[in-house]
Amino acid sequence: MSEPRTTSQGAKYIPWDTIPLEPLSPLLDRQFVVGDNIMVARVLLKKGCIVPEHHHVNEQVTYVLSGALKFWIDGEVIVVGAGEVLCIPSNLPHQAEALEDTVDLDVFNPPRADWINKTDDYLRGEK
């Protein structure tokens, strides 16, 4: 396992396997890395996991690495499968369900303060 390090100019190298998984519910775990103006999260959802409707000021890009997520956005259903990307503008309400065991990368600009300070109660629970 490689160790995280920062260069003299501030570039950060952080292997995922050095970041502890944060369990949010029995069906949802995550890890994240925060830069100055951006954040990337590795999210692991078990089949049936529901991310309740919410919105945030952060622009979001979700890239599904494996599995599939069903999103409800603006009255539409969008299924995002492995290798596919969904861009969600700032303040747009959205909800998701894992159709199968899924791993995705979520990128946020700016970083999610509620995730960093653990006030993201909508994610913490049984589903």
Roles of regions detected by a PLM:
Residues 1-37, 120-127:
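A short, N-terminal "cap"/entry segment at the start of jelly-roll beta-barrel domains
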Residues 24, 31-32, 43-44, 51-56, ...:
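Short histidine-centered beta-strand/loop micro-motifs
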Residues 44-46, 56-71:
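Short, conserved beta-strand element in jelly-roll/cupin
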Residues 61, 68-70, 77, 93, ...:
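Structural motif
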Residues 65-66, 81-82, 100:
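A cytosolic small-molecule/anion-sensing beta-strand core signal
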Residues 75-90:
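Short acidic-glycine-tyrosine-enriched beta hairpin
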Residues 90-114:
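Ligand-binding loop in jelly-roll beta-barrel domains
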